[in-house]
Amino acid sequence: MIGRMGIDDIQPLVSAGQYPAKCVVGELIPISATAWREGHDALGVTLHVETPYRTSFDVRMSPATEPDAFNAAIVPDAVGYWTFRIEAWSDPYATWRSAVTKKIDAGQGAEDLANDLETGARILGEAAQQVDGTDRQLLLDAVDSLRS
């Protein structure tokens, strides 16, 4: 079962969303949100931006110092109507990394972590199937490293 996720307190927000936020070309626009989920698995948050050119791009939002807070920034390069949305998703790699880091900090060695290392290799192997080029090779090298 995938736990429920929520996104709250999205900024910038003007008059509860009645009016668009305004800026000038070249201005750094901070965007933030509070995102949470049920359970202990890690959460990833992405900022999806649509430009006036009818193109779009995604930015991975960074965790802030406050609990459940995430930040990103964009710099508009053209006059026009820009829109954004924030998406939350389950992050199996971050969940795995957090668990393995705790086990290593507790003194467990490679032999104790054999199952965990194979789990990480499978997560990275699945990710490698979704990318090409040097990113794919980097992930496949990490898979080999975890399995050796």
Where are these regions (language model features)?
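Non-catalytic, glycine-rich low-complexity segments
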Residues: 1-38, 97-131
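Catalytic cores of nucleotide-enabled group-transfer and carboxylate-activating enzymes in metabolic
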Residues: 5, 14-16, 23-77, 81-85
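Extended acidic/polar, glycine-enriched regions
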Residues: 57, 62-148
